[in-house]
Amino acid sequence: MSGRTLLSVFVGTLLLGVAAAADARDHRACSTARAAGEWGYTKTGTLVLPTGATLFASVGRFSLGPDGVMEGENNGSVGGHVSKDVLKGTFEVNPDCTGAMTIEVYDESGNLLRTIAMALVFVDDGRAARGIVTSLVLPNGASLPSIITADAKRLHRDYGNRGWSR
């Protein structure tokens, strides 16, 4: 092979390697640590109470820590009754960008109101997440049927700016 041909093969191979590395970076696996940061979200849906179905909505902000700890606060409405709630929980994110979260919801006095389990999927390279409530349990142990979905967007990747939470 001539020097020119060898140089062409070398440059071509190098360019293919760089392109493959760039492609690999674009498809990084998701993880609990990569999800860490500050998030804003909305949840909407329906709760099935013993007295009948009622609408549910909330908007809030939460922190996800690289250690799988979640905390935040929200303003929620159940059937038009608005309250401010404190959120504490845990989460995990799988390499395929699915995940799970368990959230304990407290009133401002520290009384447990409910415990929620959610199934999650992180999208848009970890800049957003979608979720659905898979379980809602009251403090007395009673399960409450619900159809509630969530939409969250990352505010920023910084973790530790939690002065707004309790």
Q: Which residues fall in each region the model found?
A:
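Bacterial N-terminal signal peptides
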Residues: 8-17
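Mature soluble binding/inhibitory domains
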Residues: 22-166
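N-terminal secretory signal peptides that target proteins for export/translocation
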Residues: 1-4
